[in-house]
Amino acid sequence: MKILKGLIVFICVLNQSCTGQPSQKINGVSFVASNDAIDVSHIHPVINVHANYAAIMPFGFIRNLEHPELSFNSERQWFGERKEGVRQYVETFREANIQLMIKPQIWVWHGEFTGHIKMQTEADWKTLETSYAKFILEYAALAQELQVELFCIGTELESFVENRPDYWNDLILEVRKIYKGKLTYAANWNEFEHTPFWDKLDFIGIDAYFPVSHSKTPTVEECLVGWEKHKPSIQNLSREYNKSVLFTEFGYRSVDYSGKVPWESDRQKGLVNLEAQNNTTKALFEMFWEEEWFVGGFVWKWFVNHNHVGGENNTMFTPQNKPVEQIIKQYYKK
């Protein structure tokens, strides 16, 4: 019996603590689906930035915020958004020894915010629940088959969660029957404090688009001060549930005022400001990456064709081919 106990402790030390905290930070990228299969050459830039995790994101589509049925695994979708693409992406990342999270997401036509999905009748709620469960359980089964380390049961679905808490508790139980890895949910930055089922998951997942500065070009110090109004509530929730926090998404656009409304993704808004992106990103790393209760995160977002995306004239989130890529590389290397 002593030998067995010693072996269990040894395995826990090698892989992660027995409470579920990995021994190494999750230094992840949110890998955007494309319309083609990938190969190891597409993963070399991920390796070069010292990432050890990638989030693979299949999509389900919904007509509008009150429509109850999801469409997914359709031939009209891009390859990487479908089940066959997810499988191929996971298998290719595995060849490069990158660990994975499968993170199914919903896209509402015209880009409306998923947090506002809300049905108007009980019948429509039931239809949505059935449709969403089919979506999630199919990818949970794939995650189990492929031995994926992390699975995310939903992303920024505040109204759905708020209105149907019993459904979500039941869904987690159903996922647990299929998938034996670690579970999280990606709560929006202003949603996580009242997400009701953290006790049933392994990590508290937050899409970390917290406002931290009103300046055109915020300094690192200013952003650190801005984080002080948010960090205590994040840490307190971690203590309350005895769960590590995972930033299921984090990142900033390379625009003026990048720390003011970091969730905004309108291509028409903002002038290029690489320094603003650098400083907001540095502050996030300095504020969280050394905390024991913080497990890591996935930078938003990383595209397949590295040499043809991002760059110093790009105002969007991707860090690729911008100075901030080197900052991420520096912190991910630690």
What is each model feature region?
Residues 102-106, 152-161, 169-193, 242-250, ...:
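Aromatic-lined carbohydrate-recognition surfaces of secreted/lumenal glycan-active proteins
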Residues 4-14:
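Sec-dependent N-terminal signal peptides
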